[in-house]
Amino acid sequence: MTAKVSLEEKFRETGGKRPYVQRLFGRIARVYDPMNRLMSFGLDQRWRAFAARYLALSSDELGLDLGAGTADLSIAVIRNSGPGTRMIGMDITPEMLEVGRIKIARLGLEDRIDLQVGDAEHIDLPDNSVDGCCSAFTVRNLTDIRQGFREMLRVVRPGSRVVCLEISHPPGKMFGFLFYLYFYKLAPLFGTIIGKAFEEYNYLPNSLTTFPDAPTLKAIMEEVGWSDVRFYRLSGGIVAVHVGTKV
């Protein structure tokens, strides 16, 4: 049985991909941040800072962070934006948001970051209501990638950007081999030994099997209506930041 079939069977057992992902991240919420630091060798914070600089909201503007999780990207956007900038962070997993709220309170940012339970494919906001939208490691978990990008396009104001940070497929044989070795072999091992969560961290490589590479994701964004779409490969292409504008 292939990894893809196995993952699809897990989705069926839990009623679909969305409830599976919600349950999975709920179980690892308390170890999510330290495991991210460990598994990325600390690079995940640099990647988020890079993405945040491309969103870089002006003073008093409102941004939206989809799949906000523990709020690292929302915090990075606030740090890279003008005074009075505010963020709405949405995620389908309450346990992740609770970790994020503790972090936000510790930093004294409660009046600038509002975390809410919400679905990136059905955003509970009016059309043209935010000045920018971002996500980190969220698009891969969507049931329908195109629907997610359509919703992002709907809620941002004309002239605003979307910035998406995602694990990607690096070009070239050397980085491709290292990518395969790390994400398909070592990451589940780290998750098992340190996080005691084999299924959760085995989901990571399995979810990448059918996830589009950076040029294909760019084409999907253009297909649903985003303009001036470009992407930036980081760390040899193991992650990519996609940027698009609503005209």
Model-derived segments and their meaning:
Residues E121-G132:
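A short acidic, Gly/Pro-enriched loop at the edge of an enzyme's catalytic core
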Residues S227-V247:
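Core SAM-dependent methyltransferase catalytic element
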Residues L165, H169-I220, V224, R230:
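C-terminal alpha-helical "lid/dimerization" subdomain adjacent to the S-adenosyl-L-methionine
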Residues P34, F41-E61, A76:
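Conserved alpha-helix/loop element of class I SAM-dependent methyltransferases that forms part
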Residues P83-G84, V156-R161:
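Short glycine-dipeptide loop
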Residues L62-H122:
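Class I SAM-dependent methyltransferase SAM/SAH-binding core
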Residues Y32, C133-C134:
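Hydrophobic beta-strand segment of the Class I
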Residues R146-P158:
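A short glycine-rich, Lys/Arg-flanked "PGG" loop and its adjoining helix->strand segment in the class I
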